[in-house]
Amino acid sequence: MTKALDGVRILDFTHVQSGPTCTQLLAWFGADVIKVERPGTGDITRGQLQDIPKVDSLYFTMLNHNKRSITLDTKNPKGKEVLTALIRSCDVLVENFGPGVLDRMGFTWDKIQEINPRMIVASIKGFGPGPYEDCKVYENVAQCTGGAASTTGFRDGPPLVTGAQIGDSGTGLHLALGIVTALYQRHHTGRGQRVTAAMQDGVLNLSRVKLRDQQRLAHGPLKEYSQFGEGIPFGDAVPRAGNDSGGGQPGRILKCKGWETDPNAYIYFIAQAPVWEKICDVIGETGWKTHPDYATPPARLKHLNDIFARIEQWTMTKTKFEAMDILNRDDIPCGPILSMKELAEDASLRATGTIVEVDHPTRGKYLSVGNPIKLSDSPTHVERSPLLGEHTDEILRDVLGFNDHQVAEIHDSGALAPPRKQAAE
């Protein structure tokens, strides 16, 4: 069966997490992703957070499935020739270098267009044009500058970053969509274009409901926030709201049976208006159905702390799974707080390919996330990440069409090996 992106070739100059997230998704959809790495060291994450000495780390392997690796010294004249040939042979170049790095390598947008007018150049940067465009950005910096951290946490505590990688992986997913869109447009125009995704922009896009609330503040308090029911005035910016739901339906994380010893014995509970009477029945507060303080959604907003305290009295008598079973029968929205251990052992996630077991030649078997997007006519088979330079000769021969003599010349030039250190005179 053919894959959705069969025939698309990606020149992957990305490293760490944001860019590799993008190119891995494209590889899962069938693109031929050629990862260009520095000879001798490769992507820095190969050696970061290693759990097994002298093998590629999980940090690297889980972001680089289904790719081929070529090592190339792009400062070497022969290396530049190979890179030029790769640009000529590929459809998309993806990079997440610091600002200006590609230009300093001698491959400006104009130069790339001269080599291959159909080339799409896709870039991840920390910021878009503006006062911070030259600043270095990592995951947590993106969360802090994109509005996520200022609105995450509790009102009386400091800003918090989320455990989800919305800055790195989130921006990588945004860029992948931009690349596919540019490929579609190229089908009609025949021309390549530049695609850029800034991490600050990506985080702000994912935090859009907070920008919504910022504008609502001009017209009065945010009544679904706990702060309103507590009688605490709002300031001029969206506050941190703990675990309050951001969708207009009051929600909280509540303790379940065993919370004293299990840090994840909790459930998220949404007091949705259409099932309010069922909630009252479940927790044994049938009088709330008609009580003026609880009968309508507007009336309940001033009493959310009391309401959820009472619901929590009930959830604490059940395990999170028992509570979920009972609540789901009445269509009451809820979800258990699942640990990474529970997710790793979830048979249904294995069955759908959301979590997969991968066999690697040096580190053995490990678990990874699979493709979260399922296409009925383009199923994803997760293949292990490449060893450093594993496909160098294969790419030189099969992609670029170099003969044995040319390949030997490239090897002899030092373009595929770590640069030699000059001895001090």
From Swiss-Prot:
Active site residues per record: D168 (nucleophile)
Query: Where on this chain does CoA bind?
Result: 17-18, 38, 72-75, 96-98, 104, 136-139
Pfam families recorded for this chain? CoA_transf_3
Which Enzyme Commission number(s) are on file for it?
Answer: 2.8.3.16
SUPFAM superfamilies noted in UniProt: CoA-transferase family III (CaiB/BaiF)
Which residues does UniProt call coiled coil? none
**What is the catalytic activity of this protein?**
formyl-CoA + oxalate = oxalyl-CoA + formate
Q: In which pathway does it act?
A: Metabolic intermediate degradation; oxalate degradation; CO(2) and formate from oxalate: step 1/2
The answer to whether keyword Transferase applies is: yes
What would be an example GO MF term here?
A: formyl-CoA transferase activity
Binding of substrate: at which residues? G247, G248, Q249
Q: Which keywords does the record carry?
A: Transferase
Q: Could you mention a single GO BP entry for this protein?
A: oxalate catabolic process
Give start-end of the signal peptide: none
What this chain does, per the entry, is described as:
Involved in the catabolism of oxalate and in the adapatation to low pH via the induction of the oxalate-dependent acid tolerance response (ATR). Catalyzes the transfer of the CoA moiety from formyl-CoA to oxalate.
Q: How is this protein organized at the quaternary level?
A: Homodimer.
Checking HAMAP family in the record gives: Formyl_CoA_transfer (MF_00742)
Family, similarity comment: Belongs to the CoA-transferase III family. Frc subfamily.
Q: What is this protein called?
A: Formyl-CoA:oxalate CoA-transferase
Q: Which organism is it from?
A: Rhodopseudomonas palustris (strain HaA2)
Q: What is the lineage of its organism?
A: Bacteria, Pseudomonadati, Pseudomonadota, Alphaproteobacteria, Hyphomicrobiales
